[in-house]
Amino acid sequence: MSVGPLDPGVAPARLVAMSVDVRSAILIDPAGGLVSASDGDSERARRLAGLAHEMVSAADSAWSGASDALEAQTLGGAIFAVRDARYTLACVARRLALPALVVYDLRQTMLAIGGSAGGAQPGRPGKERSAIREERSPI
């Protein structure tokens, strides 16, 4: 019995269900349009989609070539994104989440929906990017 690809409409909810560290997730198209979200709050999902698209666009501007996996850390948590030519799957995770595990879960979810689990441009190897933002305590 073969199992078909995962419906993109449920991919973010599946990611949140399978990863204890992931708080919220969204799936967007290359233009930043919201495809689906784990959160029932549509305004929050649209905001997260816009921010994820901005993060991916900023990474593309900062480095030559497209990145297939991104990570940004703050004191309050982290945002991760994995993309291919069709979708970007992004999530917000708790602060102490292990990045390699979160990226693994993102890639597995992308594979389940029929994505390439990385490789922003078909036929080109992807690159992972990490930007860590340090915040200093005023004390």
What are these language model-derived features?
Residues M1-S24, P30-I139:
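Acidic, low-complexity cytosolic segments
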